[in-house]
Amino acid sequence: IVVLPPDEFPSTKLHKKIIAHKPVNNKEKLEAYQYEAYNKFQVDINNIGSEFSSLGPVKRLNVLLNYLDTSTNQTLVLPAVLAESVSEFYFANRPKRKREVVKASRITGVENLQAAQFLGDMYLDINIYENVIDLFGKSFISPLANYARSMYRFYLDDSTYIGNKFCYKLRFEPKNTSNLTFHGEMWVHDTTYAIQSIKANISEGANLNYIQDLYVEQEFEQVEEEVWMLKKEVLLLDIRLTEKTKIYGFLGKKTSSRKHFIINELKPDDF
């Protein structure tokens, strides 16, 4: 039996290569980039009980009870807010400036519902290549942080072709679940060591006040030889606003897709 030291584990070797290639694969290296974005935000009321109709924001909206549905865990949910937008996004690095031109948008749902405020909070730019990811006022350690191996355990679980690219599946778990970390898995391209996709939940011990759980899923596309850009993203939030009574909460979902990437084409300052 050959016992390998931790630095010789296949998972450790792979993670070291991912970290070494971060400067190449991180979009922050680019002078500029542009893309068309589609964003869909949805907020559903869940954990609905008999007291729901007496709550202030919906006290006089009993007609909404006709739209009740049942979630996968057999709890009642009520669609509350739906917002969609199509926009053109531009970013330049030095100096940093960005502009988003909304081409089309719509929002439907319950006016003045407390859940609506979370639409803005869900508009996050989660860059997994950063050492720290800020979420709702808390700083989480990324599994791609330069020092991530001191906070996470990594496991090389699988390898396969995704499309025409050979990738490794790297699973990650926090060493201490009370730390602000994630658990999940990522697929890593074997040539560029870029992240092809990642799925992650916040650690069980993370305290985000009203947020019970947060899940993020990202998929990247190689748009040039040394440029990978975020192509698709799903963000799920389980929000509990009435923790003491546990009467109801919210399920928030953001779905994003990006296409028509333009790389390193600078625009005038007055664009």
Set out the residue ranges of the language-model regions.
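Periplasmic N-terminal soluble interaction domains immediately after the signal peptide in Gram-negative
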Residues: 1-9, 21, 215, 235-247
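Surface-exposed extracellular loop regions of Gram-negative outer-membrane beta-barrel proteins
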Residues: 190-204
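Hydrophobic lipid-interacting interfaces of membrane-associated proteins
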Residues: 40-43, 175, 203, 236-241
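Short, surface-exposed coil-to-beta transition loops
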Residues: 180-183, 212-217, 251
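Extended lipid/amphipathic-ligand handling interfaces
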Residues: 184-186, 190, 215-225
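Structured extracytoplasmic
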Residues: 4-167, 173-181, 249-271
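Outer-membrane beta-barrel proteins
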Residues: 28, 48, 203-213, 217-220
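Short, hydrophobic/aromatic-rich segments at coil-to-beta transitions
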Residues: 32, 163-171, 196-199, 227-232
